[in-house]
């Protein structure tokens, strides 16, 4: 790694520690030329699968779309932003764990529903009504009955 002070090509690692629950490494480095010290952080670059929509269009995974969908369902519901971020993290982990390069948007919708079911039942029904395209009150009732079982 290049020294940020003198631009020398060679630096040495003095100390390494795991941070962020083991998801990244903090390294203390020293330049072998000017002897200045600096800190670097190393994080694994995790690639998300591409999303295959119902019309067969493929697009990159968009975390903002995921967050937006969750936030719409959770609007005016007593769920913390930390809980939402944890749900997003769980969904992303499950998607990466598939090992697939592409994942159907329906799979993502199912994962969202699973997380919403744990977070807030009202938000779950809101999301399900759009995701499953409920046409009438009977379908709402059936979904609520399934939720209560």
UniProtKB/Swiss-Prot annotation:
Keyword Electron transport appears in the UniProt entry: no
Domain ATP-cone: from-to ranges: 49-139
DNA-binding as UniProt keyword: yes
A biological-process GO annotation: negative regulation of DNA-templated transcription
Annotated keywords: ATP-binding, DNA-binding, Metal-binding, Nucleotide-binding, Repressor, Transcription, Transcription regulation, Zinc, Zinc-finger
InterPro entries (alphabetical): ATP-cone_dom, NrdR-like_N, RNR_NrdR-like
Start-end of unnamed zinc fingers: 3-34
GO terms of molecular function: ATP binding; DNA binding; zinc ion binding
Cofactor needs: Zn(2+)
One Pfam family of this chain: Zn_ribbon_NrdR
Comment on bound cofactor: Binds 1 zinc ion.
Family the UniProt entry places it in: Belongs to the NrdR family.
Function description: Negatively regulates transcription of bacterial ribonucleotide reductase nrd genes and operons by binding to NrdR-boxes.
Protein name: Transcriptional repressor NrdR
Annotated gene: nrdR
